[in-house]
């Protein structure tokens, strides 16, 4: 039976978040609701989750020694990775020393880069995926593209939010695509994956929870991508019963192979009744922010319940709902927001992440809406997001 100690007291139950962005912030809030002591860690100061944590630290999370020292200092009961760019080999070592890594260290190691999870899905589990090759030199990259054929997609094996990702339609784009991929990796330049283009009707995120009371699924989430990053997401995404069943079967296989308790964001391509595995993250997913308004328990609440070893019970979905990102472009270290009075009309909500600065384009918030149908929910969310005016000195 779980015992939770009181935060800031000797018997506190401590949760260390490795990654303190907007997703980590919502996880921190859910931890706070249960009286857990929250320690937020990121590579920069004043990250969103740090605003709602009991303590925070700024370290290079790719530095295994620094990570080990911080864990020894804070003595967390749960280590919760919220990003890919972490010294996962150190997480494996820490787990062997008795630390509880969420969902487990092997899951974070395999999913920190696209190669580990692709080989697990395609080669070990024999799941349907796109054709693919890996390369770590320009010559190997050029050959891999020739093997896959045009059009194809190149991505750093370790990146997020579309960084370093590009669509290659002809040979003239090869050099630029290689150089862009080398700039976009979370751990610097290095290995890339080249994927054949999959013809699909739509993409979904199937939030899949592995918990003490079994495997649970949220309703499928549809989303629109632009420049490799999501712009709107909605729930539920309409799909055939056969496709949904196949999606659940694939997702269950993947999360069972990864192991541990927690929420996983499984990305899938759907074409008619056929489902193709794309990627998985062993943590809440950005497209899943729609669950802040669409369900009785958000993806963040579900993640916390699962990793604490608590039962999930019943997940209720309230009907057509959507999220739309607030994505301004400016340079400022003193960001201000206006227009909330206009944005908050009808069944809408706004989340402003509290990021300390912006240099170029950056996701600073999200608008959420519920409506009678998906199309209306998306339009209402987009309109609400567009009504937020962002400025800075």
Swiss-Prot record:
- This chain's protein is named Formate-dependent phosphoribosylglycinamide formyltransferase
> Example GO molecular function term?
magnesium ion binding
The UniProt subunit note reads as follows:
Homodimer.
- Member of which family? Belongs to the PurK/PurT family.
UniProt signal peptide: none
Q: Which UniProt keywords apply?
A: ATP-binding, Ligase, Magnesium, Metal-binding, Nucleotide-binding, Purine biosynthesis
Organism whose genome encodes this protein? Yersinia pseudotuberculosis serotype IB (strain PB1/+)
Q: Sorted alphabetically, which InterPro entries does this protein's record hold?
A: ATP-grasp, ATP-grasp_carboxylate-amine, ATP_grasp_subdomain_1, PreATP-grasp_dom_sf, PurT, PurT/PurK_preATP-grasp, PurT_C, Rudment_hybrid_motif
Which parts of the sequence bind ATP? Answer: 114, 155, 160-165, 195-198, 203
Answer whether the UniProt record assigns the keyword Metal-binding to this protein.
yes
Q: Which GO CC terms are listed, alphabetically?
A: cytosol
Give the record's pathway. Answer: Purine metabolism; IMP biosynthesis via de novo pathway; N(2)-formyl-N(1)-(5-phospho-D-ribosyl)glycinamide from N(1)-(5-phospho-D-ribosyl)glycinamide (formate route): step 1/1
Q: Name one GO biological process term.
A: 'de novo' IMP biosynthetic process
Give binding positions for Mg(2+). Answer: 267, 279
**Top EC class for this record:** ligase
Q: Which cysteines are joined by disulfide bonds?
A: none
The Enzyme Commission number assigned here is 6.3.1.21
| Upper taxonomic lineage | Bacteria, Pseudomonadati, Pseudomonadota, Gammaproteobacteria, Enterobacterales
Ranges of residues in domain ATP-grasp:
119-308
- Superkingdom of the organism of origin: Bacteria
Q: Summarize the protein's role.
A: Involved in the de novo purine biosynthesis. Catalyzes the transfer of formate to 5-phospho-ribosyl-glycinamide (GAR), producing 5-phospho-ribosyl-N-formylglycinamide (FGAR). Formate is provided by PurU via hydrolysis of 10-formyl-tetrahydrofolate.
């Amino acid at each position: 039976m779980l015992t939770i100690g009181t935060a800031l007291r000797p018997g506190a139950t401590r949760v260390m978040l490795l990654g303190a962005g907007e997703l980590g912030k919502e996880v921190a809030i859910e931890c706070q609701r249960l009286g857990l002591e929250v320690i937020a860690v990121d590579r920069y100061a004043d990250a969103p989750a740090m605003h709602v944590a009991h303590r925070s630290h700024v370290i290079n999370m790719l530095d295994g020694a620094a990570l080990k020292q911080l864990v020894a200092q804070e003595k967390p009961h749960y280590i919760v990775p919220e990003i890919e760019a972490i010294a996962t080999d150190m997480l494996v070592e820490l787990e062997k020393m008795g630390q509880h890594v969420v969902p487990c260290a092997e899951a974070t190691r395999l999913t920190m880069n696209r190669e580990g999870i692709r080989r697990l899905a395609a080669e070990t589990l024999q799941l349907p995926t796109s054709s693919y090759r890996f390369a770590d030199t320009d010559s190997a990259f050029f050959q891999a593209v020739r093997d896959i054929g045009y059009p194809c997609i190149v991505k750093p094996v370790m990146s997020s939010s579309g960084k370093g990702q590009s669509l290659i339609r002809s040979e003239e784009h090869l050099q630029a695509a290689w150089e862009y991929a080398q700039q976009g990796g979370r751990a610097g330049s290095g290995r890339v994956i080249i994927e054949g283009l999959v013809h699909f009707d739509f993409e979904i995120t199937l939030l899949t929870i592995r918990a003490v009371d079994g495997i649970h699924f949220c309703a499928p989430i549809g989303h629109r991508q632009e420049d490799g990053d999501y712009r709107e997401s909605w729930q539920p995404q309409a799909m055939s019963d056969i496709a949904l069943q196949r999606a659940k079967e694939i997702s269950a296989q993947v999360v069972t192979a990864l192991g541990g308790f927690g929420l996983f964001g499984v990305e899938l391509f759907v074409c008619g009744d056929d489902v193709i595995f794309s990627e998985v993250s062993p943590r809440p997913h950005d497209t899943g922010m729609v669950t802040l308004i669409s369900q009785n328990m958000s993806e963040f609440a579900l993640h916390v319940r699962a990793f604490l070893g608590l039962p999930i019970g019943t997940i209720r979905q309230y009907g057509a709902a959507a999220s739309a990102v607030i994505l301004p472009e400016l340079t400022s270290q003193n960001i201000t927001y206006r227009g909330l009075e206009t944005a908050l009309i009808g069944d809408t909500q706004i989340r402003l992440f509290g990021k300390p600065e912006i240099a170029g384009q950056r996701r600073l918030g999200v608008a959420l809406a519920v409506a009678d149908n998906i199309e209306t929910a998306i339009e209402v969310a987009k309109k609400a997001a567009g009504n937020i005016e962002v400025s800075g000195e």
